[in-house]
Amino acid sequence: MARSHPLERYRNFGIMAHIDAGKTTTTERILYYTGKSYKIGEVHDGAATMDWMEQEQERGITITSAATTCLWKADEGKGPEHRLNIIDTPGHVDFTIEVERSLRVLDGAVAAFDGVAGVEPQSETVWRQADKYKVPRMCFINKLDRTGANFYYCVQTIIDRLGATPAVLYLPIGAESDFKGLVDLVNERAIIWKDESLGAEFFYEDIPADLADKAAEYREKLVELAVEQDDEAMEAYLEGNVPDVATLKKLIRKGTLNQAFVPVLCGSAFKNKGVQPLLDAVVDYLPSPLDIPDVQGINPTTEQPDSRATSDSAPLSMLAFKIMNDPFVGSLTFARIYSGTLTKGSYLNSVKDKKEKIGRMLLMHANSREDIEEAFAGDIVALAGLKETTTGDTLCASNAPIILERMEFPEPVIELSVEPKTKADQEKMGIALSRLAAEDPSFRVSTDHESGQTIIKGMGELHLDILVDRMKREFKVEANVGAPQVAYRESLAKPVDVDYTHKKQSGGSGQFGRVKVSVAPGERGSGITFIDEIKGGNIPREYIPSVEKGMREAAENGHMIGFPIIDFEIRLTDGAYHDVDSSALAFEIAGRAAMREVAAKAGIKLLEPVMKVEVVTPEEFMGDVIGDLNSRRGQIQGTDSRGNAQVVEAMVPLANMFGYVNQLRSFTQGRAQYTMQFSHYEEVPNNVAEEVKAKMA
């Protein structure tokens, strides 16, 4: 089976957006018009094809990025057929990890905004993440049929809040309930949709007279932005020659790929208007896999930087970006192929230096699947039955190993204890949690040594809620869930020196190890550094890693109330060993005991996670919101107005944010919303530290 579409006709893109900007609806419509799902699924009634997990259907938010393949011919079907791989990204802040992960494998993105609100807090977060991965993107201002929708205000928010340069390609005709079509500035015509054909049919007419001046003004702005991309076009334009449509499209494409500006489109996916122009723009302006730089990695044998060209003949390299449990196929690993050709039955090398056999290979459509024998560079495939691969791993040809950059995953800030209700649930719970942790690297599972409880940790209350819920539904595990706990940390109060000797004599060979360490608290976020300053072999080389291991393990178990001690520097300055009695174990025990002595001598300060909280509220509740945040030990960082709403930014300890969503809804009548993400660890005030100690004791 040969390649069906040349690489330049591939578009791997995602739709990124704030919770309610209509991302799933837009994806649904794309699938409908590209002919893959024949009945339009509405999120309002929980049937969208992309949202295939039960919880998503209930909550109406997208949780997992399903990858879907569809085909599209631009220019009303006259253009060459393109293959679109759409990666659905979640828009809720507890799932930013999923967003990071999908951005890593996209070539381009469409940012969808709500036509009333414009750029919202979460849109900014996702936009910054896309900046980090240098993803070329365009904007789709959606929901223009809503009361209060204002296209021009939204364009202004792209400038004010994202600092981006918008290149407007379409203007809306009519607003709110009278919204009926678009002015196409590139082709200088109006597009009107027919409601009775579910928006599948539309016709062209002249630009309405009342919009003629506005259209001329916006087209001129667009042309000026475009000609800046090319010296010849610029000179011609200054001499009074306006580029023709084909040239204009080329220049817009160039500017989009260079991220000089972002094309702006508009419509209402729910009312089936503006989706076809959006698809045409994806084809015309977003990058193909050939337009993005070669994927970078490291050669594991030489540890030198290496790269792979996007071509079927290059050695195979691919990145696993998502693992999901599919009720019919079992575990599915979604992977993006950057280079080479993948055939069913072949063996690949995983980062862990294990061999993986490719069994079933599937192309996913929201929830139907097609078996394939072969896949090529640029494809996004789902692989069944991989044993060793986790999210973020590279799979590559065994004769040409490469490790594509690892993704970075944030540390979890909130934890819960879960206990199985019955003995039968115990075993199932273990399996369920390990599967869920394999799917989602921002979710951790551990056992509390003292109480024997299972602790799960994640990025926020919603994140853990959904995971516990999935455990019940997918794995049929009934569990009692404890109250959420804050992931506190401990830190050393002052620098200390410790000289510790571990000695044990019990007939035969004993144990002996002596270590001298200087330990000092470091900057917040610096982690634990271990510096070996042993001179003259006082501790043999092979025992030094054991000292470090012992000290790190003791730090992990904490001292005051059992939370890990973080951010300090250990200098191993001296020590002693015995020819017969010394061993790796003896030095590990010495390291562990030395660390405990360090903690006792230096004294411990308790640290708590502080969250960056942003509340968007109508003006009249502003006083209540600020008062409430202050009562939660919050520090107000600033306020700002956004359209007709006010934004309050504050730093608030996580311990005081539990249940905030319900409280906020009650005193703002459900009209305010907030986002919260981890900012940093900070020392806990003494009175609070005493309370925490008493509670944990």
Swiss-Prot record:
Subcellular localization, as worded in the UniProt entry: Cytoplasm
Residues bound to GTP: 17-24, 88-92, 142-145
Keywords for this protein: Cytoplasm, Elongation factor, GTP-binding, Nucleotide-binding, Protein biosynthesis
S-S pairs: none
InterPro entries: EF-G-like_DII, EFG_II, EFG_III, EFG_III/V, EFG_IV, EFG_V, EFG_V-like, G_TR_CS
HAMAP family reported for this sequence: EF_G_EF_2_B
PANTHER family noted in UniProt: RIBOSOME-RELEASING FACTOR 2, MITOCHONDRIAL, TRANSLATION ELONGATION FACTOR G-RELATED
Name of the featured protein: Elongation factor G
Organism per entry: Sphingopyxis alaskensis (strain DSM 13593 / LMG 18877 / RB2256) (Sphingomonas alaskensis)
Primary gene name: fusA
